[in-house]
């Protein structure tokens, strides 16, 4: 993610005075903002070391699930700038279209972070640490778990010598539909239809690990459909009263 953010900052006309990926020894003592984009497990140590001698400067981190308060007691001005997107080094992204979620230690600092965020994205939102944790959790379901299902599908196809490419039109249409429909309304397949014979036959083709995943996912689809239908019925009943 850091590489893509760096490109976006440069394209927006910002002067990047230093990039430090391995060591903080060459980190300048003065800059308008220090952006810490490291893995979550390293963030606390990086903050502690980066802030030394720069306690009056503005620091932000980019982690979706980590608290802004990691900076508390280390520096005076701090915040979060979280781009919600999946990043891979060899894939270009349009940063202007990526939603950025920000928060800050105080109102003046918020305005500085907001200006920085607005310069690289058209979609900037204020969000607290508590709410951002749920946003990041939702992203894990929508992106990480979904991609894992692609990997499982690729394994199933490979058993019969079929290329993963045959899934791409299906994957693309599934993604397009949720631009217009609620995900539950867009759900198709044997689980949402309650076709138990098909589910039993398909799970029998799988090893124990995949069969367990298959049945858990199928039960979740059925439960979600039932919950969604009940909620919609209550809403419709309320409108008729």
Predicted regions: what they are:
Residues 1:
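Hydrophobic/small residue at the entry helix of a nucleotide-binding pocket
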Residues 5, 12-15, 92-179, 236:
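Internal alpha-helical scaffold of NAD(P)-dependent oxidoreductase catalytic cores
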Residues 5-10, 14, 22-92:
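Rossmann-like NAD(P)(H) cofactor-binding subdomain of soluble oxidoreductases
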Residues 42-43, 67, 108-109, 148-149, ...:
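Short phosphate-engaging motifs
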Residues 64-66, 85, 106, 171-175, ...:
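Glycine-rich beta-alpha junction loops
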Residues 165-241:
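NAD(P)-dependent Rossmann-like dehydrogenase/reductase catalytic/cofactor-binding core
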């Amino acid at each position: 993610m850091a590489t893509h953010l760096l490109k976006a900052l440069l394209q927006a006309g910002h002067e990047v005075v230093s990039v430090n990926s391995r060591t903080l020894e060459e980190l300048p003592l003065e800059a308008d903002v220090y952006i810490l984009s490291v893995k979550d497990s390293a963030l606390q140590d990086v903050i502690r070391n980066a802030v030394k001698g720069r306690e009056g400067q503005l620091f932000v981190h980019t982690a979706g699930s980590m608290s802004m308060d990691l900076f508390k007691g280390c520096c005076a001005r701090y915040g979060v700038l979280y781009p919600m997107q999946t990043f891979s080094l060899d894939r270009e992204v349009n940063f202007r279209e990526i939603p950025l979620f920000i928060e800050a230690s105080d109102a003046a600092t918020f305005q500085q972070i907001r200006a920085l965020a607005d310069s690289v994205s058209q979609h900037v939102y204020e969000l607290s640490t508590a709410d951002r944790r749920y946003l990041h959790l939702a992203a894990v379901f929508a992106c990480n778990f979904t991609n894992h299902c692609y990997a499982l599908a690729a394994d199933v196809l490979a058993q019969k010598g079929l290329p993963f490419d045959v899934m791409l039109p299906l994957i693309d249409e599934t993604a397009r539909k949720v631009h217009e429909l609620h995900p539950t309304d867009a759900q198709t397949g044997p689980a949402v239809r309650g076709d138990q014979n098909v589910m039993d036959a398909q799970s029998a083709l799988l090893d124990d690990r995949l069969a367990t995943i298959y049945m858990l996912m199928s039960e979740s689809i059925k439960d979600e459909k039932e919950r969604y239908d009940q909620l919609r019925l209550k809403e419709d009943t309320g409108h008729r009263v």
